[in-house]
């Protein structure tokens, strides 16, 4: 009986901390852009105006798992906006974008939402730049809607099953047990470990100064966002098993960048296989770099965008 009382007290206290903490996080990190309604759910977008004299294609930046558009803004937004119109989106369920409860976790679902968002914004045949899970989304979009894409720059994208070794664990967290954890203990513990976790993602490069604050990384600790993230990662292995069979049909210019020390998405298990299967893919493996190439090797990513822009204009 005493044990039960302790458990209830801990969970109850965690629930109160989570409720208050989520509100404080949202108060500290306000939306950067505007909202577009897609099927009754608001999608948060930020637009950066490019050089009006340039004929460069627009660029759409897609963030990875457990993140939000602030990460891509911090790494590439202003840099690419010098030459391109840049659009950043919070993927459904992340940042300040909403999604229907229990739905929208697969890259195919999110590609449909992205198509609607870009259509509303009048973004014509952009270059999609996606990091990690966002790279998978960009790849799916190009396979499903090739006529709507000028090209791809994929940064450490999961392309085949076996993602991070975490898909089964995240699928478990998407169950009612995960719901209870997300609404009670995940935020208090996550607030302690989010900086060390971010540091691990950047290895072997150092974590940029004030990264957690400047990227609004704490937004992922809100219960709904945690559940969305667990569902997204949990479904990825099964989704990629089917999508991998389509890579030979990829029809747009594509550059893939990966670090040879990326432990989250190792090149041999993912990008190397994609490049072997898809004739339009150019693979660049950077020695000594890890998973967060868009920060650690931003110049190389920007160069890849310009190369894809040139290739797309020549076709």
Feature roles, as predicted:
Residues 1-58, 82-84, 123-124, 310-315:
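Alpha/beta-hydrolase fold catalytic core
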Residues 46-49, 53, 88-129:
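Active-site loop/oxyanion-hole signature of alpha/beta-hydrolase fold enzymes
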Residues 48-96:
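Conserved HGGG/HGGXW glycine-rich cap/lid loop of the alpha/beta-hydrolase fold
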Residues 130, 134, 138:
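Gly/Ala-rich beta-loop-alpha elbow adjacent to hydrolase catalytic centers
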Residues 143, 152-183:
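Flexible "cap/lid" loop of the alpha/beta hydrolase fold
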Residues 167, 186-249:
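Conserved alpha/beta-hydrolase catalytic His-Asp/Glu region
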Residues 255-289:
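Conserved loop-alpha-helix segment in the C-terminal half of the alpha/beta-hydrolase fold
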Residues 279-315:
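Catalytic active-site module of serine/aspartate enzymes centered on a nucleophile-bearing elbow/loop
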